[in-house]
Amino acid sequence: MDFSLKQLAAATMMMASLAAFSTAAHATITPQQSAVILKTFSDTHVTDFRQFLGALAKSELAQKDNLGPTISAFLDNKALAPEQQNEIYRLLGLYTRLKYGKAATDTLRELVAIPTVNLDDVPQYENPQFLKIADKIKDLAKAFNLNFRNIDNRVYEVSLEGSGDEVVGIHAHADVVPVTPENWVLKDGTQLDPFKVTLIGDRMYGRGTEDDKNGIVVAMYAMKVIKEEQLPLARNFKLLIDTTEETSGDAIPYYFEHNPVPNYNLALDGGYPVVIAEKGSGTVMATFPVRKGE
């Protein structure tokens, strides 16, 4: 199970749960059950979420996992208990992965192929590669029927409107750290292209596959599905794509100088208690002797 597709399902579930309801509840569908559902429907063509739920309701999986009542209530437009809402969110995430997993991976390949690294003596907002990725994201937003704003080539804003006044800010970034191509060699001697996504086993290799172009992809596809399925949104969503996260960090402050700060803010490339670490993580602890003051 590759990382980006896990994130695609998770992001859809998360955004759907934030969008419409405020009651907290624990989802009852386990990772093991999710894996079985994905495997069962991996070769099945799904057209829309309701069709997917209808097919799932007729399967032994729904009976075994007692999902029938939740699915029936949703399809009949009945009020759902908090636990049922979370089950629907999780199923929506699984549906998104089944329907758009390959497309999302292809989009990630296209974004990774754009070498959005910092250039000496060239501001990010004048860097040709950032102008290129801005156009790519703009075209993608248009294809997904999402709103797009380019804030002076500093931040790219992709938004999905809801009925309320509150705004949920989803943060990702388009810039990546520089690469040393000769270091991109696997233990078996395989030479990799840093700006070409290479899938080996259950791992994707390529600069930005984790940090953080996958965050752009999963958020936009999650917004696409929410739009397609016409989910009721009590909050507005704004995906804020930073261009300076790996360098000066001045793009987001520039954005907030000219735009309101969202009511809620989420970073897709790290969140407590889980944080993505591209090359491993570590904790440094230091002690210093106390010196008496004079």
Named regions from a protein language model:
Residues 9, 155-156, 266, 286:
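Well-ordered beta-strand positions enriched in small/hydrophobic/aromatic, beta-favoring residues
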Residues 293-294:
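Polar, glycine-rich mid-to-C-terminal structural blocks
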Residues 1-25:
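Gram-negative bacterial Sec-dependent N-terminal signal peptides
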Residues 38-44, 48-205, 228, 233:
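Acidic/His- and Gly-rich active-site-bordering loop/insert found
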Residues 160, 288-290:
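Short beta-strand-to-loop capping motifs
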Residues 208-284:
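Acidic/histidine-rich catalytic neighborhood of metal-dependent amide-processing enzymes
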Residues 186-192, 280-288:
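A short, gly/pro- and small-residue-rich
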